[in-house]
Amino acid sequence: MAREPEKTVCQNRKARHEYFILETYEAGLVLKGTEVKSLRAGKANLKDSFARIQNGELWLENMHVSPYEQGNRFNHEPKRPRKLLMHKSEIMRLWGKTREKGLALIPLRVYFKDGRAKVELALAKGKKLYDKRDDIAKREAEREIARAARGKA
């Protein structure tokens, strides 16, 4: 049987606008049962979420997973901190890098890979306003070039 492709649950599209992505990592996500069901239904939001290292463990903060509709009193808290699973050596390398000024761990997307929930984490540096303006200007220039090329063809 063929492997099923990764199923993306949600993306943090604003992260690429607000940060320079330096490196990306894959981490497992520790979830409760109702959280898995909500994620499979696509009811999650990565806006304003971030990861931090505390006591040698990696935690995902501010990720909103809506309560499961059919869940009863055993439902989960929507914005609870969720543990991320990575090798200890990777966590320590990230800890050293996040000590640098201006670097942060930002989740880019949540997806299912072989039935397990994963998070794509990025080591990112915040953009200044003029960097964002430069990116927008480049994008507009590329659009103009594509529009002109399409008009000639």
UniProtKB/Swiss-Prot annotation:
What is this protein identified as?
SsrA-binding protein
What is the protein's species of origin? Answer: Desulforudis audaxviator (strain MP104C)
**Sorted alphabetically, which keywords does the UniProt record give?**
Cytoplasm, RNA-binding
Report the GO molecular function annotations. Answer: RNA binding
HAMAP family hit by this protein: SmpB
The leader peptide range reads: none
The primary gene name is smpB
One Pfam family named in its UniProt record: SmpB
| Domain of life of the native organism | Bacteria
**What's in the GO CC field?**
cytosol
Q: What is its main location?
A: cytoplasm
Q: Which InterPro entries match?
A: SmpB (IPR023620), SsrA-bd_prot (IPR000037), SsrA-bd_prot_CS (IPR020081)
Cell compartment(s), UniProt = Cytoplasm
What's the stated role of this polypeptide? Required for rescue of stalled ribosomes mediated by trans-translation. Binds to transfer-messenger RNA (tmRNA), required for stable association of tmRNA with ribosomes. tmRNA and SmpB together mimic tRNA shape, replacing the anticodon stem-loop with SmpB. tmRNA is encoded by the ssrA gene; the 2 termini fold to resemble tRNA(Ala) and it encodes a 'tag peptide', a short internal open reading frame. During trans-translation Ala-aminoacylated tmRNA acts like a tRNA, entering the A-site of stalled ribosomes, displacing the stalled mRNA.
